């Protein structure tokens, strides 16, 4: 039964991308089976079995295009439904839909499944059905089982009984619609999809869902089977629009290549001239070999875009559909006859054989007569075999039952040349063909195995390359880290050695500092002892000072007692003078009253004045007789000499106990103090001289006043009754008051001078005592000078000897330190030389290994050695 491929065209509405581009629909629907494309670069009218517009429903597509195909499958025919079109044209939507549970959104495949099980449920009970399904995809020209995704490179085989099939493909027996849906979901989840600029979920492979239905009549034993291929082709892609790159670009190349092979097969099937159909150029065309010009009833759904944005792709799709519509298939029922039918056919064949044998014998006799040259009358000719002609006609009109085979040779032998292109003209025997198919299957298995091995090897190679790249990067990083760590280790090693060397030097310096510390400790102990001695001396000096103050107090008391300046005596003298003054006043009043003054009164007044004069003279003698100027000068000189001796002794003591810097500082301070003391003493002596002169003048003045008073008394007594005026009395009283004030001032000065005199006497006594001690210790002044000279020489020699000893000790210490530093430096040089030698050996090894010189690091090592070494004559920075 010859039939053409049914071609159905479906247009989808414009999508978001086309609207954003400002495109407009360019398709017109002239009739239910005709559409016209009107665009600048593409135009034409196309006629198909049916054309569905942009508002068509899924149910409309199924009812017209697919429902008869389901009935054919149940009658034992093979069927194929596949969708073709550019990417994003709606192929997957047409085949699968959006939702299996939504009646409006379900696609062709779910509706076919529902129709199959509905037909099975409505069939007679004498027929048994078996339904099995399989799901595969062709991704990157490799057949992958979607129900077992680990099987990603299955081979294609061809056998006499089974035809073309995929070896190793999992077939699942199903008994309900839901089980088929589960298989569809399971396979759909494993299918490869990706996002492009044309489609958010673009199929990157051709998917093929196969439904095989086997039915058997339990009463007659007859059986027949049908196989339905539901193909969702990946869309053709234009890279400029999809923006494919990387892996997506490689997938697009493989998709376009397989679609080009499909187009070549269709072209060769429809041109009527090709002697070879290139089914084996692509695995897609190889699997669909029976669907394209073989034992199958095929429906092609072409999906198109109505937009001007994709006008060129739409034109190409419509032309593809027109070419496919010209393909003629010869479908036949895949049936197995029952034993009764086979017996009837056998009896019929045997009767035909008997008839044919009789007819052949008649024809052979007639032929022999003709060969002998005899003529056979026309009425004796063998008549045509009417039964044979009728049988041939009946056989031609009735489809002959056969085994379920889709072998290409049988279908092609029965297909007229006008309907499809011829197969290769080389005749092949049945045995040779079976051997050829067997050999082809073996080679196909080997090819598949080799492809699997190649794929595994390529994967291993990629993994190895990635691992090698990673290892190279890691090795480079490790080498850099190793070099860095090596340089750091060398640096740390050099720093460690430098620190060890510095530690040795520090130890040497520490030893020298310890020795210096010991010496300073000894000197400190000595100074402490000297300080203790000085404190003891200070205590003795304090005691001596207390004794001195005591003696001073005693001498002051003794001296003041000599002056008879006690309170009682002084009061009596004052009373005497006051009585004299009162007596003079009374005489003055008596004289003023005009009374006569007795001479006895004048004698008594004269005696009292003489007594007063004696008291004044006694005070003058006590003050000036005990301390003359010469004695004071002599005593001052002795005290100054004694002070110089004490200062010299003190300086000697400081020189023995202090260093040169301290001695110089103390000398400077003493010189300043001595000069200040000298200046103070000179000023004090000058002040004393001035005061003595002043007091002498005052005494002379008092003498003059006293003489004046005596003269007045005498003159008063001579006048005997002549009273002086009131002014004279007042003058005498004023003079007496002034005398009283002067007397008090003189007494204060006298007491101060007595204190100074006592101090000088005490100092003089101490100086005399020391002088006597010195005289007792030395026979004469010459011997004393000689001893002083010898002592100074001895001190100088001792000082020089001490300096020499100190210099010798310091030099010995410096020599020892220098020797230890020299030993440490030699060890350091030896270690650096060994390090340099090791570095040179390592650099030589690395140079031979990597093929490039590394001598610049030797310069670095030399530079490091030069930086780490320093002159041998450097002295330690320590205090000797």
From Swiss-Prot:
Principal location listed in the UniProt entry: cytoplasm
Entry-linked SUPFAM superfamilies: P-loop containing nucleoside triphosphate hydrolases
Subcellular location: Cytoplasm, Cytoskeleton
Phosphoprotein found in the keyword field: no
Gene Ontology terms, MF aspect: ATP binding; microtubule binding; microtubule motor activity
GO term, biological process aspect, one: microtubule-based movement
InterPro entries in UniProt: Kinesin-like_fam, Kinesin_motor_CS, Kinesin_motor_dom, Kinesin_motor_dom_sf, P-loop_NTPase
One Pfam family of this chain: Kinesin
Keyword Transcription regulation in record: no
Lineage: superkingdom: Eukaryota
Region (Disordered): 388-426
Example of a GO cellular component annotation carried by this entry: cytoplasm
Keywords: ATP-binding, Coiled coil, Cytoplasm, Cytoskeleton, Microtubule, Motor protein, Nucleotide-binding
Bias (Polar residues) ranges: 399-408
Binding positions (ATP): 85-92, 235-242
Residues forming coiled coils: 428-849
Annotated ranges, domain Kinesin motor: 4-327
Domain notes: Composed of three structural domains: a large globular N-terminal domain which is responsible for the motor activity of kinesin (it hydrolyzes ATP and binds microtubule), a central alpha-helical coiled coil domain that mediates the heavy chain dimerization; and a small globular C-terminal domain which interacts with other proteins (such as the kinesin light chains), vesicles and membranous organelles.
Record family assignment: Belongs to the TRAFAC class myosin-kinesin ATPase superfamily. Kinesin family. Kinesin subfamily.
Function: Kinesin is a microtubule-associated force-producing protein that may play a role in organelle transport. Its motor activity is directed toward the microtubule's plus end.
Protein name: Kinesin heavy chain
